[in-house]
């Protein structure tokens, strides 16, 4: 019926069987951003937010989210991640924080969804902790920056103009 790997011949949803795939090192890096007012950005980096250290809470939330991706996205395989990193890069000229997450493992399926989930939940955590100051924050541009390993090889998003 289709070339979609998560659909069978009758169009029913299924989890892909990865048992026959080779175990390889797989790494994915995702990015996104959250735009805010200058005051909110100053509060975050001045550690002047009532709820606490925003970036450390967002980092922890991102790591936890990467580990729980299979609980959130129905056809994702539960993975034994070996590494998750979440970093933040302030961009005061645009009143935003860039968020980057990396996930890796040695396994039979990729970690793209885990990296994307880490970025998404880190951004949501920043929003949650700062919404009393700035309800107009905008989470955007969440995308896969790169991935390596597996049958499909290497993907680099900068081919498409992403940072």
UniProtKB/Swiss-Prot annotation:
Recorded protein name is Cyclic pyranopterin monophosphate synthase
Which residues are substrate-binding? Answer: 75-77, 113-114
GO BP annotation list:
Mo-molybdopterin cofactor biosynthetic process
Q: Which gene encodes it?
A: moaC
UniProt function note: Catalyzes the conversion of (8S)-3',8-cyclo-7,8-dihydroguanosine 5'-triphosphate to cyclic pyranopterin monophosphate (cPMP).
Q: Which domain of life is it from?
A: Bacteria
Active site annotation, chain numbering: 128
- Stored SUPFAM superfamilies: Molybdenum cofactor biosynthesis protein C, MoaC (SSF55040)
Per its record, the protein catalyses: (8S)-3',8-cyclo-7,8-dihydroguanosine 5'-triphosphate = cyclic pyranopterin phosphate + diphosphate
Work out whether the entry's keyword set contains Lyase.
yes
Q: Give the similarity note.
A: Belongs to the MoaC family.
Subunit-level organization = Homohexamer; trimer of dimers.
Keyword Cytoplasm tagged: no
Question: What does the record give as EC number?
Answer: 4.6.1.17
Q: Which UniProt keywords apply?
A: Lyase, Molybdenum cofactor biosynthesis
